[in-house]
Curated annotation (Swiss-Prot):
Region of interest called HRN, as start-end residue ranges on this chain: 91-190
Region called Required for interaction with UGO1, residue ranges: 630-843
Name of this chain's protein: Mitofusin FZO1
Species of origin: Saccharomyces cerevisiae (strain ATCC 204508 / S288c)
Gene of this entry: FZO1
Chief place of localization: mitochondrion
Sorted UniProt keywords: Coiled coil, GTP-binding, Hydrolase, Isopeptide bond, Membrane, Mitochondrion, Mitochondrion outer membrane, Nucleotide-binding, Transmembrane, Transmembrane helix, Ubl conjugation
Outcome when changing residue 518 to P: Abolishes fusion function
Annotated segments matching region HR2: 769-831
GO biological process: intracellular distribution of mitochondria; mitochondrial fusion; mitochondrial inner membrane fusion; mitochondrial outer membrane fusion; mitochondrion localization
Extra information: Present with 1000 molecules/cell in log phase SD medium.
Domain Dynamin-type G: 184-467
Length: 855
């Protein structure tokens, strides 16, 4: 029982450890001795109103001898035993408090590790045998092999390891919680396990001295069975079966089971055990309550008068993977492991895996090697099994005499044990039944029983608290090792980071200077091309109307003067459009050349860092409508635009000098040199003769009107001179002479204006358009439009150069920033692990100083 009082009743037999019969006879044996676990000491004789009980020996009270009652005597041996028990209990309680504090402190360390691992993944040396972890080791199994056992173990990325380590921390934290519960619990749980069909149930029956659990040559225990003293169930012997529909897993069954709540279990009799233990598909856990009151406390295991003990019989390890996993997990909740080994098979792989897991906290485990009598070479069998135990549990190997027992009898046959299940009425027991009165001596099994009782009862601190101390010591050692390895790793990383930063700084300066030079050079080339296109457009428009007269539309006579005016105006507008088109073509060519050059420079200077997938198409430039101001490029016409007389032109016309328009090539069919000379003399070379015939007004462009006026005028003047020659000096003669002169002159002037019209109209329109261009600032606006288009196009490659340079600089700056952040993070980690290391070392020293050997 975990609380209350326990009474040790007189066995009427000498203690089995006594060697001197006379001493036994002289020893005063108490009739009743009451001990309170809650108070931690033995109770006085006046407890519950007991006064002057001369059959009780405590605090000077009287007892009786083994053969007859004697007067009250003080026994110095009993007094010493009482003091020793109280000191042992005080030492146990003190160690329990220290361990609880250490567990809480270690949980705080694990929380800190978890927080650090979430922020900065913790480094775990998975393949380093020199820094092999015990509890926090990550055994990653791949293709049937563990990474820690391979020389060239596979490597896992750091973040992936940190996630695995997170799961390990959660598992360790849960284990620490289980440890804390076990330290608080005053009862002890003895876990009997082993491979399938090794006789675990038979061993359990042997320890209980009764055939309680079913035994068979085939595996029959499939459900975890925990055997407890019936006092915890009001003295009623029965089975509490926790079904799977209430608790699907073993852990849930343990947590949900409550003896005060019948809804959490089913009640069965002990007779039904053979039918219950195989039903792992129906039950998760069996709680078996039996009475172990037919034996004295000195030999009873469950009712020993010192501590509540429960035996747990488990399914075989290698029978089912799910059950094996449950057995593995159950070891965290028990205090002592009794591992049953078949001498013929020795320790299997599943057995080794369980022992390795359990040895994290349990330095000492009992090994019971059964069927040893069937082995021919017993010494060799012992050596092989002990060698396996030495590798898995070194402390157990060192104390093999107490913890490794080779049992010759297989335990399957118990002819000397009374089978309580054979009674029709289980509660009907004969008081004089002696369950082992006919038992034959078995030194091997007796040695096992003595060692087990001595370890569980007399060395309670070791059996109950040593697993917690061992686990804490190993866990703290792991934390120390992890702290040291991480501090070392971060210190080495800091050296590398400093070297990388020293190398990176000049690279950044060089890249910045190179990018500045490159972008400046590209910008200058772009500005030069933009300026060139601006000047070219401006110059083209300025020279657009400086066209030779012969390139203007041909004059077709007065009858088609309107067409001549319209065609001349259209010609001037077309000249302006052509100059704009030529300037745009020039801009396209220059832009195309520069874009290719910029891309080539970018690839040569920046290499693979310059990535441009754009394809420049110059034909897509200037696809927008011409400048809107071109719609207003219209001039008004007047009659005066047809004339532009000059004295020089008039005198040239009168003197028959060079013609107004340039001569055309020889007209087809006019091959006679004399005829050509005559037409040239008369000014008829500008048009074919047929046009002069069809359009008589074209004659005004020749010399015929002048010759006609000259001929008529000279005839009139000469006739007047001949008729009035002697009167030339008289006023009347001059008056008569001036009339024909004025008429001829007027006619000559009129013919000159008509003759000059093919020159005057183009010249006047050209002057008007030039003024209009200046008035509208048309030249500058179009030059600006062209240069802006070039600027927009060149902005793409220049920006790509700039962007590539920025990417290069950003990469280096990001690398630098990452290194600096990594350095800062490493410093924080070093500081964290330094603090964790110091705290863990101090805590480990405190744990190591807890002395559990004093009982």
């Amino acid at each position: 029982m975990s609380e209350g009082k326990q009474q040790f009743k007189d066995s009427n037999k000498p203690h089995k450890d006594s060697t001197d019969q006379d001493d036994d006879a002289a020893t005063i044996v108490p009739q009743t001795l009451t001990y309170s676990r809650n108070e931690g000491h033995f109770l006085g004789s006046n407890f519950h109103g007991v006064t002057d009980d001369r059959t009780t020996l405590f605090d000077g009270e009287e007892g009786r001898r083994e053969d007859d009652l004697l007067p009250s005597l003080r026994s110095s041996n009993s007094k010493a035993h009482l003091i020793s028990s109280q000191l042992s209990q005080w030492n146990y309680n003190n160690n329990r408090v220290l361990l609880k504090r250490s567990i809480l402190k270690t949980q705080a360390f694990m929380d800190q590790l978890q927080e650090e691992n979430n922020i900065r993944p913790i480094f775990i040396a998975a393949n380093d045998e020199r820094e092999k972890l015990h509890v926090l080791q990550l055994n990653i199994k791949l293709d049937g092999q563990y990474n820690t056992k391979e020389k060239n173990g596979f490597n896992i990325e750091k973040k992936a390891l940190s996630k695995l380590f997170h799961s390990q921390i959660v598992s360790v934290t849960n284990h620490l919680n289980a440890l804390k519960k076990r330290v608080d619990d005053v009862s002890s749980k003895v876990f009997i396990t082993g491979d399938v069909n090794t006789g675990k149930s038979a061993l359990c029956n042997s320890l209980l001295k009764q055939r309680l659990l079913p035994e068979d040559q085939l595996p029959c225990t499939n459900v975890f069975s925990e055997i407890l003293e019936a006092r915890e169930n009001d003295g009623i012997e029965e089975v509490h079966a926790i079904p799977l529909n209430i608790a699907p897993t073993l852990k849930e069954a343990i947590d949900m089971y409550s003896i005060q709540n019948p809804k959490t279990y089913e009640i069965h009799t002990l007779k039904e055990l053979p039918d219950l233990v195989p039903q792992n598909g129906k039950y998760a856990l069996l709680k078996i309550y039996i009475k172990d009151d037919k034996r004295p406390a000195s030999t009873s295991l469950l009712r020993n008068g010192t501590v509540d003990i429960s035996l747990i019989d488990s399914p075989g390890l290698n029978m089912d993977s799910l059950q094996t996993a449950e057995v593995m997990s159950r070891q965290e909740e028990i205090d002592l492991v009794i591992f049953v080994v078949n001498a013929e098979n020795q320790l299997t792989l599943s057995a080794k895996e369980f022992i390795s897991l359990a040895s994290r906290e349990k330095k000492l485990m009992f090994f019971v090697v059964k069927k040893f009598d069937k082995i021919r070479d017993k010494q060799r069998c012992k050596e092989l099994i002990l060698k396996q135990i030495r590798d898995l549990s070194p402390e157990t190997y060192k104390r093999a005499a107490d913890f490794v027992h080779f049992v010759s009898k297989n335990g399957d046959e118990l002819p000397h044990y009374h089978n309580e299940n054979d009674n029709e009425d289980h509660g009907d027991r004969k008081p004089d039944d002696d369950p082992y009165s006919s038992s034959d001596p078995d030194p091997d099994f007796d040695s096992l029983e003595d060692s087990l009782r001595n370890f569980v009862l007399k060395k309670r601190s070791l059996s109950k608290l040593l697993p917690a101390k061992t686990y804490l010591s190993k866990l703290l050692s792991d934390i120390i090792m992890i702290s040291k390895s991480n501090m070392k790793m971060y210190s080495e990383e800091e050296i590398k980071i400093n070297e990388q930063l020293e190398t990176l700084r000049p690279e950044i300066l060089s890249a910045r200077a190179k990018c500045n030079d490159l972008t400046t050079s590209v910008d200058q080339m772009a500005e030069q091309t933009i300026t060139m296109t601006y000047n070219n457009t401006k110059e083209a428009l300025l020279n657009a109307l400086d066209v030779p007269l012969h390139e203007y539309p041909k004059y077709q006579g007065l009858g088609q003067i309107y067409d001549f005016i319209f065609s001349t105006e259209a010609f001037i507008a077309n000249q302006i459009d052509e100059s704009i088109g030529s300037s745009e073509l020039f801009a396209k060519q220059k832009t195309d050349l520069l874009v290719k050059k910029i891309y080539e420079i970018g690839k040569n200077e920046l290499g693979d860092d310059f990535m441009c997938e754009r394809v420049f198409r110059s034909e897509l430039m200037f696809r927008k409508r011409k400048h809107l101001i071109g719609k207003r490029l219209k001039v008004s016409l007047s009659i005066t635009d047809l004339f532009a007389p000059t004295w020089k032109g008039f005198l040239s016309y009168l003197s028959w000098q060079k013609p107004v328009t340039a001569p055309l090539p020889d007209i087809e069919g006019q091959t006679n040199e004399g005829q050509i000379g005559l037409m040239k003399y008369l000014g008829l070379k500008n048009y074919p003769l047929t046009q002069y015939w069809s359009r008589p007004s074209l004659l005004f462009t020749s010399k015929i009107p002048t010759l006609t006026l000259y001929f008529l005028g000279s005839t009139k003047v000469v006739g007047n001179i001949i008729l009035n020659g002697i009167k030339l000096s008289s006023w009347s003669s001059l008056k008569k002479l001036s009339v024909p002169v004025i008429v001829v002159g007027s006619l000559l002037g009129l013919t000159y204006l008509i003759h000059d019209l093919p020159r005057a109209l183009p010249m006047n329109l050209s002057i008007k358009y030039k003024r209009k261009l200046q008035e509208l600032d048309y030249i500058h606006l179009n030059a600006q439009r062209t240069s802006n288009e070039v600027r927009d196009v060149l902005r793409v490659p220049t920006r790509e150069i700039l962007r590539s340079c920025e990417i290069i600089m950003d990469k280096k700056q990001i690398t630098k920033k990452e290194l600096e952040n990594k350095k800062e993070s490493n410093l924080l980690s070093i500081k964290f692990f330094q603090s964790l290391y110091e705290g863990t070392v101090a805590q480990k020293l405190m744990v190591e100083e807890i002395n559990l050997d004093i009982d």
